[in-house]
Amino acid sequence: MAYPGGMAIPCQDTAAAPRPAAVSALPARSSPYLRRVAVLSLHTSPWAQPGTGDAGGMNVYIRNTSTVLARRGVAVEIFTRATSSDDPPSWEPVPGVTLHNVVAGPFEGLRKEELPSQLCAFTAGVLRECVGHEAWRHSLVHSHYWLSGQVGWLIKDRLGVPLVHTAHTLAAVKNVTLAEGDVPEPLQRLVGEGQLVAESDRMVANTQVEAGHLTQYYAADPQKIDVVPPGVDLGMFRPGDKAAARAELGLDPSEQVVAFVGRIQPLKGPDILLAAMAEVMRAKPGVRLLVVGEASGSGLSPEGIMATAERLGVADNVTMWPAQPPAQLAKVYRAADLVAVPSHSESFGLVAIEAQACGTPVVAAKVGGLPVAVADQVSGVLVDSWAPERWQAEIASLLAAPERLRAMGRAGVAHAGRFSWEATADGLLASYRAALRGGALAPMRAVRG
């Protein structure tokens, strides 16, 4: 099949293909053969603030799953690229998790798109750390995103350990749903992802939708794909008093607030939301758009969003905040009447599940894993278009129905309660064991998908 980016990869009919193994809860204990896992996150540190630079849902995923795995008795060593001379070579952010900052290229000035030039340097740094001991001490390698996957592939080949890979996003899918003005993913990434599908011992997909994309666009073997949905920190993201949250954040208690949380880039669709909200605000006084996040890559910026709001005449009703730590972010969700996720591509949609866990309904694009993260017409609404007028209509309808919003909020708490990082760790442990055995998982019931 040919797709934007210029590359053709054989595809198979996903309807006729066997369904990938779906992973659900397993006993909370680690295998005696699974002692230590090397986690590769080249382009962003899991302890970086989500919503800044290239940090987002993947960071949240690695941080939480590593923490839970460590509690289960699996030592986790994370390797990421150092981005400051102040970064310590190694440190322990939580007990049982060691984070190594590998020097690979200059600390500043390299965009994510330029990091393929540093794959050799990063691989050399990882190997020096690992081979410098008496014996290779890791049971397996788990790589995240295609750049890390290339490094993991070489380590697998060099040291003879299994490779588990999680893509998080796929170039072929992003190119099919490309945002207006966004840049297509390059051929080198498409080729690299195809190689990883072939060379990984296991592929972890967030949803059955993502598993289908792997088979459709990359001819992946469904029998080595494990479906493991991400989770949410239900202790951090939980319902709370809306009035108290607004008071703490300095938001007007009389206004209706629609929140956007994420990186300011075309992929996430904040420009679409602003265009829709401008019409909502003109028709209904007392509505505010709260945008929480920072610029990532090129194409959009907080300054550009505010300039557009000025041009549309709604700047007084738009508030921009930088990315927030989890405790503050939970308050943002509780303070909002509605959270909007107009992304062009999402492998899952952690913002959506976090908002629902706090009791706030979600209006989201019907794309990727968002139909799994959001229960349509129950805990939120899915929109099968990126036309601003469609988003305006859905948002206006929800804001005009406070009882419906409250019912959706209650349903969202129940829906989000089905997803936890403990369950995600269970699924990863099952995938790891399958990789160590060199065989496929027996089919299990998915959390959802």
Curated annotation (Swiss-Prot):
The reply on keyword Amino-acid biosynthesis is no
Top EC category: transferase
Q: Which InterPro entries match?
A: Glyco_trans_1, Glyco_trans_4-like_N, Glycosyltransferase_grp1, Mycothiol_biosynthesis_MshA
Q: Can the keyword Cytoplasm be found in this entry's annotation?
A: no
Q: Which GO terms describe its biological process?
A: liposaccharide metabolic process; mycothiol biosynthetic process
Q: Which reaction does it catalyse?
A: 1D-myo-inositol 3-phosphate + UDP-N-acetyl-alpha-D-glucosamine = 1D-myo-inositol 2-acetamido-2-deoxy-alpha-D-glucopyranoside 3-phosphate + UDP + H(+)
Q: Where does 1D-myo-inositol 3-phosphate bind?
A: 43, 54-59, 112, 145, 169, 189
Its biological purpose is as follows: Catalyzes the transfer of a N-acetyl-glucosamine moiety to 1D-myo-inositol 3-phosphate to produce 1D-myo-inositol 2-acetamido-2-deoxy-glucopyranoside 3-phosphate in the mycothiol biosynthesis pathway.
Q: Which family does it belong to?
A: Belongs to the glycosyltransferase group 1 family. MshA subfamily.
Q: What is this protein called?
A: D-inositol 3-phosphate glycosyltransferase
Species name: Segniliparus rotundus (strain ATCC BAA-972 / CDC 1076 / CIP 108378 / DSM 44985 / JCM 13578)
Gene designation per UniProt = mshA
